[in-house]
Amino acid sequence: MAKPLSITSSLPTFSVTWRAYFEMTKPKVVALMLLTVLVGMCLAVPHAVPVQPLLAGMLGIAMMAGSAAALNHLIDRRIDGLMARTYNRPLPKGRISATRALIFAASLGSLGFIVLYSLVNPLTAWLTFASLIGYALVYTAYLKRATSQNIVIGGLAGAMPPLLGWTAVTNEFHGHALLLVIIIFTWTPPHFWALAIHRRAEYAKVDIPMLPVTHGVEFTKTCILLYTVLLAIACLLPVLVGMCGPVYFVCSSLLSTGFIYKAWQLKYRDHDGSAMQVFRFSIYHLMLLFMALLLDHYLWN
């Protein structure tokens, strides 16, 4: 006689499945994005952020960002299976079907939109929806495969989070929030191009026209260096308009100098692993830069 299926025997499968769904939301990327959302919220008000827009805003934006990431997994499942960096993702490995991934992404995005629309404000809900469409459809489904400037153009969607945080609290646009968008928009190309140099052969294999594939590695190194200089200028804009004080100025200057130096090393002192060093440094650069914005806001202002 067959033994009845116990509840405990189904738990491992349940755990593995939900880990796969969680992986599809790109939690590390979303965590860094939420830091920029939080900074946008905090800089929008002189004192403490109201509890409801803080909690509901972070939750709704996180859910819609996770939805966009899941759609990215779904759309890229074929090329992900051919690349060493991504072949072990849930969809290429068959841990989740394409249909279930679509249902998950649609459900998560819809719930996030409802949270933002009903508990925060319609402006933030629609802006977050526009960012989702920009990343998941405009960038992933079209630009990524259409042009070597995919990261430059598509980077606008990924630069929106500080603005989303700002509007979640104030329900309006502000020039200061747009300065934060400009910083992330300028940061995005050197960040991704460094990774693209390291993974150039893989992108070429799947016909993704990343800049190192279409224009060569040396040209891309030059672009990275030039963009880090442009980023350093963009990072000074909050100081020039009186948005930030000396705490941010010092931190920003040090971080920008470090990023430019790493890019210079990549261009003129390249060695195995240099591109990934630039890539990793760029992550710390953005994280520490926005923490400096937060620190300056409460210590100086």
Swiss-Prot record:
Q: Name one GO biological process term.
A: heme O biosynthetic process
Principal subcellular localisation of the protein: membrane
Q: Which GO terms describe its molecular function?
A: protoheme IX farnesyltransferase activity
Q: In which pathway does it act?
A: Porphyrin-containing compound metabolism; heme O biosynthesis; heme O from protoheme: step 1/1
Instruction: Name the residues that span the membrane.
Output: 29-49, 51-71, 101-121, 123-143, 150-170, 177-197, 223-243, 244-264, 275-295
Q: Name one GO cellular component term.
A: plasma membrane
Q: Where in the cell is it found?
A: Cell inner membrane
Q: Which reaction does it catalyse?
A: heme b + (2E,6E)-farnesyl diphosphate + H2O = Fe(II)-heme o + diphosphate
Q: Provide this UniProt record's keywords sorted from A to Z.
A: Cell inner membrane, Cell membrane, Heme biosynthesis, Membrane, Transferase, Transmembrane, Transmembrane helix
Q: Which domain of life is it from?
A: Bacteria
Name the protein family. Belongs to the UbiA prenyltransferase family. Protoheme IX farnesyltransferase subfamily.
Q: What is the protein's known function?
A: Converts heme B (protoheme IX) to heme O by substitution of the vinyl group on carbon 2 of heme B porphyrin ring with a hydroxyethyl farnesyl side group.
Give additional notes from the record: Carbon 2 of the heme B porphyrin ring is defined according to the Fischer nomenclature.
The record's annotation in HAMAP family points to: CyoE_CtaB
Name assigned to this protein = Protoheme IX farnesyltransferase 1
